[in-house]
Amino acid sequence: MELHIIFLILGGLLIVLLAGFSIYSARREKSRIFSNTFTTRQPATPIKNIVTDVPATLDPLQYGQNPVPTENESESETGHSVQIQQEVENSLREIKINLPVQETAEYTQTPLNTPIYHNQPAQPTFLQTAPPIEPLTIPTVEPIQPETTSVLEQSLEELERQAAERELDLYSDASVRIELAKNSIQTPIEEVAQPESTVITQNNIITLYVVAPEGQQFDGHYVVQSLEALGFQFGEYQIYHRHQHLGNNDTPVIFSVANMMQPGIFDLNNLDSYATVGLVLFMHLPSEGSDLVNLKLMLKAAESLAEALGGFILNEQRELFNETDRQAYFARVS
């Protein structure tokens, strides 16, 4: 316990000594700073009254001193101040500001909205005048006379009539095209006497049409490829025939395919430029073998061609072929 008390006393003494030393050193530093800034030492030589030319009005105030002027000094000071004021006024009158004549002229003549350049000569200004704008004249449109309208109507009617005639020529009857194809053959045909002559009528021919969509045509290469893929053979009258036995041209023809466009033939030498609006399939009655079987084969061939070429099947009246037409065709050969 005694050692503990002794250590506490020693610690307190050390703290007191440190605090006192710090206070002493702070005061000493403060006194040193103030001793360098302010001094109370009297000047070595006393300041004497020196007479200057500065008037009493311009003499700075002397703080802490209140001299008592005498009568002579006050009179001399007033006279001296009056003299100084007169000299100042005279010097002010003599002061004149002289500007060069050219510069003053520039300052007076130059407008405010233009920049002033003293060292550069005046530049000439050029005025550009726009060409006069002429008034726009709008031409007057004369109304169409009734006579001109009637001429246009007549020309339109004539064009429609010619288009209808061309369409009739394209979709001409199959029997007429077959006759034309027969007449086009230049080789002479010897007449053979037959015991019985048969007259071919419309009822003895069954016809189907495969036509392209409106405004389109079948390409010649696709037509030939499709026909040959279905077993048709190019032969007599320059058209394609379907023989009773596929691949055997010596067997009888059961039905044929012709071009709807005149003269109804297939020009294999010019397939690049060949195109047609449709094909016509026809079968003569009676045919070789069963007419019903041959008719079913022709219907199947027409459907395959329409699917391959992207066309439509029409009946003999050039209407869309439907189930009713199918039954009517079967009734004709039964």
Swiss-Prot record:
Keywords associated with the record: Cell cycle, Cell division, Cell inner membrane, Cell membrane, Membrane, Transmembrane, Transmembrane helix
SUPFAM superfamilies: Cell-division protein ZipA, C-terminal domain
InterPro entries in UniProt: Cell_div_ZipA, ZipA_FtsZ-bd_C, ZipA_FtsZ-bd_C_sf
Covalent S-S links between cysteines: none
Cytoplasmic side: 24-334
Principal localisation: membrane
Pfam families given in the database record: ZipA_C
Topology, Periplasmic side: 1-2
Keyword Cell wall biogenesis/degradation appears in the UniProt entry: no
Listed transmembrane segments: 3-23
Localisation: Cell inner membrane
GO biological process terms on file: division septum assembly; FtsZ-dependent cytokinesis
Membrane topology label: Single-pass type I membrane protein
Cellular component, GO annotation: cell division site; plasma membrane
HAMAP family to which the protein is assigned, alphabetical: ZipA
Subunit structure: Interacts with FtsZ via their C-terminal domains.
UniProt record similarity statement: Belongs to the ZipA family.
Role: Essential cell division protein that stabilizes the FtsZ protofilaments by cross-linking them and that serves as a cytoplasmic membrane anchor for the Z ring. Also required for the recruitment to the septal ring of downstream cell division proteins.
Name of the protein: Cell division protein ZipA
Protein's gene: zipA
